[in-house]
C-alpha cells in the first residue's frame, strides 16, 4: 500500500485530543458556512433586483424553453443564445414565474450561489498541513474572504446568471481531485468526472476547467499505470455525465438543425442555418504576448473591457504571481543552502505541498487556455476562487515563521481590494426591491389568448416578455446578434412560419419616444421596415399595441392594445411621476411595392464588403454575414454588416467605408472610399493594438513595395 493511501492510527493518548480538534473544526465549519450564506444574502439585498441585459435578453426565455417545446414556433427568438443548453436557467424561470416576491427569489438564488464559498473553504483546508490546525483554519477563512472579494462574483449574487452555479460544480470537482491526492481512490475520480461533465454540459465554457483538471491527476501519489487508469476513469465519468445532460437537448438540435450542439461546433457539423466559422468572443483576449503577460496586473486596475464590460478590478492575480515568484526564489535559495550544508532530503513530499503544487499547475494551464479562448471573467469565476486559495496558501507559507508579518500582508491586500470594490468597481444595473414578482406583467385577454407571430428587431430581444403572451405565439429575431435573410437557409424556415401565422403578424420594438405613454401609433418605422422588406413585409402603424415598462428596467410590465382600455395597474401609475419605458407591438402586412433601386445598391455594397473581409479576415469575422439596409433620406442608402466575433460594425455610406466598435466606443475608423473598393481590392494593414482595432489603407506605392 502506498504511504499516502495508508490510514493513520493515533496513539490512545492522542485520540481524545484529536476528537476535540475534530469537534472544534466542525463547529467552525458550520459558522463559516452560515457566515458565507449570510454575506451572499446581504450582498444580494444591497445590490437590488438584477435587471441586466442578459436577464432580459435570454435568461428568462431560456428557462422557459427548457420546460416548453418552442422549436416549432420560435426561430432565433433570443438570438443565437436561444439554442444553448437551457436547463441551467430552468430554476430561475420557475422561481421568477411562481409569483414569489422578487426578494424571496433572489434570496433563494443567493443562498445556493453561496455554496461556492463553502467549497473554497474546503479546498483551502486541503492545501494546509493538518498538524497546524489553527493556521489551517485561519488560512481557509482568509481564502474564503479573498474568494468573495471578486467584483464579478459579487455582481452575480442573487441574479439569473448561471456562471456561479456551474462554477460550483467545477470547484467541487477540483476539490475531489485534490482530496484524491491525499487519499487516492476510484470514487473521488469518478465523482469529480461527473461534476465536471455536468458543468461542461450546462455551460460549455467550463470545458477548459475540465481539461486543465487532467493536470491535477498527474500529481496522484501512485505509480504511472495506476495514474493512467485513474485518468481514464475520470475521463469516462466526465464524458458519460456530459452526454447524459446534453442528450435530451442535443436530440432536438440534431433533428431541427443537423447539429447536436447548434450553433456551436458548426464547422464540424456544418448546419446551413448558421456560419461554419467558429464562434469566438475576442473582446477580452490579449492582442499580444506582452499584453498576456501583463494581464494579471491589468486586471488590478479599475478599467473597462479587461475581463468584463464594466470596471472590475481584482488584485488576486497580481498577488498570486508575485507570491509564486517569491516562493520559487525561496525554494531555490533553500535548495542551494541544503545542497551546500545539509544532507540530501527525503523523496517524500508532504501531501499538502503536493496538493498545492497540483492546484497551482492546474491553475496555470487553465489561465493560459482561458486567455487564448476568451479572457472573459464571467467564465473564470471557478478559477478565481481557486486563485484565492493558492494565493493565500503561498502567503502563509512564505511568512510561516513570521505570523504577525503574514497578518499584516493579508490585511493590507484585503484593504486594497476593499477600496477597489468600493471606489473602482462598476456594478450592474439593479432595480429597487418591491413586494412584487420579478416580472410583474399584466396582459389583456386578446394578447394572452390569440397567437401571433412576432418579429423582433435589435440585439436586445427583450425575450422576457414572450412567456406572458399567448402560448402558441411565435417569435423571430430577424435582426439581432445573428442577422437572418430570406435568400439563405434561414429564409425557408421564416417563410413557413409566416405562412402558418398569416395574417396574424406583429413586430415588437422598444419605443424610445418621450411621449410614448400618450401615443399608440408606431414609433419611427423606417428601420423596422428596412428589416422587414427583404421578407416581403412592412409595418402597419394603424394597428399597434403598447407595452409599458414601469419602475426601472423593468420591475413591472403592463401591456395593453389600442382597442383595449389600459389595465388598472397602468392607470395607477401616472407617466409624469414614474420612470417608464415603452415597447410597441404593431401589425405587419405584405408590401405592395418593391424598391427596385435597393437591389442594385445592395450588390455594390456586397462587393466592397466582401473585398474588405478578404483583405482583413482577422477583424471582420465571421465572413459574409447578412448585409443590413438602413434608408437615409438625406444621403441615400446606408449598408452595414455586423461581425459578432470582434463586435465590430462596418458601414458603407456617404461615399466611404468605415467601422465602429460599439462596445469600446470612440470615433469611426475610415478605411477608404467606396469607389476605390469597387474598382479593385485594396491592401490593408489591420489588427488590434492595446485593445483597439485598427485598419489602414496602404498607399499604391506602399502596396507595390509590399508585393
How would you label these PLM feature ranges?
Residues 48-62, 68-92, 99-103, 256-262, ...:
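Extracytoplasmic catalytic/substrate-binding loops of multi-pass membrane glycan-assembly enzymes
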Residues 412-490, 568-629, 634, 639:
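Membrane-embedded, lumen/periplasm-facing catalytic core of multi-pass transferases
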Residues 59, 156-157, 162-169, 199-204, ...:
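Hydrophobic/aromatic-rich transmembrane helices and adjacent perimembrane loops
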Residues 194, 214-215, 236-239, 243, ...:
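Signature aromatic-anchored transmembrane alpha helix within multi-pass, membrane-resident enzymes
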Residues 5, 12-14, 18-19, 209-242, ...:
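Perimembrane helix-loop-helix junctions
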Residues 124, 298-349:
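Hydrophobic, aromatic-rich transmembrane alpha-helices
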Residues 94-95, 103-132, 172, 329-335:
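Transmembrane-helix motifs of polytopic, lipid-linked glycan transferases
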Residues 132-134, 165, 171-189, 199, ...:
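Membrane-interface transmembrane helices that cradle and orient dolichyl/undecaprenyl
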Amino acid at each position: 500500500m502506498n504511504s499516502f493511501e495508508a490510514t493513520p492510527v493515533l496513539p490512545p493518548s492522542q485520540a481524545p485530543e484529536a476528537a476535540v480538534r475534530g469537534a472544534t473544526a466542525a463547529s467552525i465549519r458550520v459558522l463559516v458556512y452560515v457566515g458565507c450564506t449570510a454575506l451572499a444574502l446581504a450582498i444580494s439585498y444591497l445590490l437590488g433586483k438584477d435587471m441586466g441585459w442578459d436577464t432580459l435578453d435570454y435568461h428568462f426565455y431560456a428557462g422557459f424553453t427548457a420546460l416548453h417545446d418552442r422549436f416549432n414556433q420560435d426561430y432565433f427568438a433570443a438570438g443565437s443564445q436561444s439554442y444553448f443548453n437551457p436547463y441551467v436557467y430552468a430554476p430561475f424561470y420557475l422561481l421568477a414565474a411562481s409569483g414569489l416576491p422578487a426578494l424571496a427569489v433572489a434570496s433563494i438564488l443567493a443562498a445556493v450561489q453561496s455554496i461556492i464559498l463553502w467549497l473554497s473553504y474546503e479546498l483551502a483546508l486541503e492545501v494546509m498541513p493538518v498538524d497546524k490546525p489553527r493556521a489551517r483554519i485561519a488560512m481557509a477563512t482568509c481564502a474564503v474572504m479573498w474568494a468573495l472579494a471578486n467584483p464579478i462574483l459579487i455582481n452575480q449574487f442573487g441574479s439569473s446568471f448561471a456562471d456561479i452555479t456551474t462554477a460550483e460544480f467545477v470547484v467541487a470537482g477540483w476539490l475531489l481531485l485534490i482530496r484524491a491526492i491525499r487519499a487516492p481512490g476510484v470514487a473521488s475520480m469518478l465523482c469529480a468526472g461527473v461534476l465536471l461533465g455536468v458543468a461542461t454540459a450546462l455551460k460549455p465554457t467550463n470545458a477548459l476547467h475540465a481539461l486543465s483538471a487532467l493536470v491535477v491527476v498527474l500529481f496522484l501519489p501512485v505509480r504511472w499505470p495506476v495514474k493512467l487508469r485513474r485518468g481514464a476513469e475520470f475521463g469516462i465519468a466526465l464524458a458519460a455525465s456530459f452526454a447524459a445532460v446534453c442528450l435530451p437537448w442535443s436530440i432536438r438540435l440534431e433533428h431541427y438543425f443537423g447539429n447536436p450542439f447548434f450553433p456551436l461546433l458548426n464547422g464540424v457539423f456544418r448546419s446551413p442555418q448558421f456560419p461554419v466559422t467558429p464562434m469566438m468572443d475576442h473582446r477580452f483576449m490579449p492582442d499580444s504576448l506582452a499584453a498576456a503577460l501583463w494581464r494579471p496586473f491589468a486586471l488590478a486596475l479599475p478599467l473597462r473591457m479587461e475581463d468584463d464590460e464594466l470596471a472590475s478590478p481584482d488584485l488576486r492575480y497580481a498577488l498570486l504571481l508575485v507570491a509564486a515568484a517569491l516562493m520559487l526564489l525561496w525554494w531555490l535559495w533553500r535548495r542551494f543552502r541544503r545542497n551546500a550544508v545539509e544532507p540530501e532530503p527525503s523523496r517524500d513530499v508532504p501531501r499538502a505541498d503536493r496538493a498545492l503544487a497540483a492546484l497551482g499547475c492546474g491553475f496555470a494551464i487553465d489561465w493560459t487556455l482561458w486567455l487564448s479562448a476568451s479572457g472573459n471573467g464571467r467564465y473564470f469565476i471557478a478559477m478565481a476562487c481557486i486563485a484565492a486559495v493558492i494565493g493565500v496558501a503561498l502567503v502563509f507559507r512564505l511568512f510561516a515563521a513570521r505570523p504577525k508579518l503574514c497578518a499584516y500582508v493579508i490585511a493590507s491586500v484585503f484593504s486594497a481590494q476593499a477600496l477597489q470594490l468600493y471606489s473602482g468597481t462598476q456594478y450592474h444595473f439593479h432595480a429597487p426591491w418591491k413586494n412584487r414578482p420579478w416580472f410583474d406583467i399584466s396582459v389583456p385577454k386578446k394578447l394572452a389568448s390569440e397567437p401571433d407571430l412576432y418579429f423582433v428587431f435589435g440585439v436586445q430581444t427583450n425575450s422576457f416578455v414572450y412567456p406572458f403572451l399567448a402560448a402558441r405565439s411565435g417569435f423571430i429575431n430577424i435582426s439581432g446578434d445573428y442577422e437572418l435573410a430570406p435568400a439563405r437557409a434561414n429564409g425557408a424556415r421564416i417563410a413557413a412560419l409566416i405562412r402558418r401565422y398569416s395574417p396574424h403578424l406583429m413586430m415588437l420594438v422598444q419605443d424610445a419616444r418621450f411621449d410614448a405613454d400618450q401615443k399608440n401609433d408606431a414609433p419611427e418605422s423606417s428601420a423596422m421596415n428596412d428589416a422587414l422588406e427583404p421578407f416581403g413585409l412592412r409595418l402597419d402603424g394603424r394597428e399597434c399595441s403598447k407595452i409599458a415598462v414601469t419602475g426601472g428596467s423593468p420591475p413591472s410590465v403592463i401591456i395593453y392594445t389600442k382597442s383595449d382600455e389600459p389595465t388598472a395597474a397602468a392607470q395607477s401609475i401616472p407617466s409624469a411621476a414614474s420612470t417608464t419605458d415603452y415597447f410597441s407591438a404593431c401589425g405587419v402586412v405584405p408590401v405592395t411595392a418593391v424598391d427596385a433601386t435597393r437591389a442594385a445598391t445592395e450588390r455594390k455594397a456586397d462587393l466592397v464588403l466582401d473585398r474588405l473581409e478578404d483583405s482583413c479576415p482577422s477583424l471582420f469575422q465571421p465572413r459574409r454575414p447578412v448585409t443590413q439596409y438602413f434608408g437615409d433620406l438625406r444621403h441615400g442608402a446606408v449598408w452595414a454588416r455586423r461581425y459578432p466575433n470582434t463586435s465590430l460594425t462596418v458601414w458603407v455610406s456617404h461615399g466611404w467605408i468605415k467601422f465602429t466598435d460599439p462596445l469600446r466606443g470612440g470615433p469611426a475608423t475610415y478605411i477608404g472610399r467606396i469607389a476605390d473598393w469597387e474598382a479593385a481590392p485594396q491592401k490593408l494593414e489591420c489588427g488590434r493594438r492595446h485593445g483597439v482595432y485598427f485598419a489602414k489603407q496602404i498607399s499604391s506605392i506602399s502596396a507595390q513595395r509590399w508585393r
